[in-house]
Amino acid sequence: MGLRYSREVKQRYGEKELEGRIPITLDMPQTLYGRYNCKSCWFANKGLIKCSNHYLCLKCLTAMLSRSDYCGICGGILPKKLVFETTPSAPPYTP
């Protein structure tokens, strides 16, 4: 789940990587000035999505997308398509 595209998507686009996907980070590294946090709620530091110049958690991103297509903090367009940078931990896929 999450590693494979549906049959329709494969037939439409082939095996090439889909464009316009924003990476979702499972674990952000700690920086010189502290940990990365969600700019909206300031609590979440895992599962962050990069908006134009800041990060948002999935909960805040969903809340902002329910109101508008634009970010309430920076005014940029909110990301709608996500892709995992690292594969979530799961048993290996065996057909």
From Swiss-Prot:
Quaternary context: Interacts with protein NP; this interaction probably directs the encapsidated genome to budding sites. Interacts (via RING domain) with polymerase L; this interaction inhibits viral transcription and replication, Z partially blocks the product exit tunnel for the releasing nascent RNA product. Interacts with the glycoprotein complex; this interaction plays a role in virion budding. Interacts with host eIF4E; this interaction results in eIF4E reduced affinity for its substrate, the 5'-m7 G cap structure.
Claim: Phosphoprotein is one of the keywords in the record: no
Residues in RING-type zinc fingers: 38-74
N-myristoyl glycine-type lipidated residues: 2
Keyword Membrane found: yes
Pfam families attached to this UniProt entry: zf-P11 (PF03854)
Description of post-translational modifications: Myristoylation is required for the role of RING finger protein Z in assembly and budding.
Name listed for the protein in its UniProt record: RING finger protein Z
Mode of membrane association: Lipid-anchor
Primary location class: virion
Domain notes: Late-budding domains (L domains) are short sequence motifs essential for viral particle budding. They recruit proteins of the host ESCRT machinery (Endosomal Sorting Complex Required for Transport) or ESCRT-associated proteins.
Name of the gene encoding the protein in the UniProt record: Z
Gene Ontology cellular-component terms listed: host cell perinuclear region of cytoplasm; host cell plasma membrane; membrane; virion component
Any one GO BP annotation for this protein: viral budding via host ESCRT complex
Lineage, uppermost ranks: Viruses, Riboviria, Orthornavirae, Negarnaviricota, Polyploviricotina
Keywords: Host cell membrane, Host cytoplasm, Host membrane, Host-virus interaction, Lipoprotein, Membrane, Metal-binding, Myristate, Viral budding, Viral budding via the host ESCRT complexes, Viral release from host cell, Virion, Zinc, Zinc-finger
GO molecular-function terms, A-Z: RNA binding; zinc ion binding
Span(s) of short sequence motif PTAP/PSAP motif: 88-91
Cited function: Plays a crucial role in virion assembly and budding. Expressed late in the virus life cycle, it acts as an inhibitor of viral transcription and RNA synthesis by interacting with the viral polymerase L. Presumably recruits the NP encapsidated genome to cellular membranes at budding sites via direct interaction with NP. Plays critical roles in the final steps of viral release by interacting with host TSG101, a member of the vacuolar protein-sorting pathway and using other cellular host proteins involved in vesicle formation pathway.
Family matches, as SUPFAM superfamilies: RING/U-box
Subcellular compartments: Virion; Host cytoplasm, Host perinuclear region; Host cell membrane
Entry-linked InterPro entries: RING_finger_Z_arenaviridae (IPR024183), Z_RING-type_Znf_sf (IPR038485), Z_RING_Znf (IPR003224)
Family the entry assigns: Belongs to the arenaviridae Z protein family.
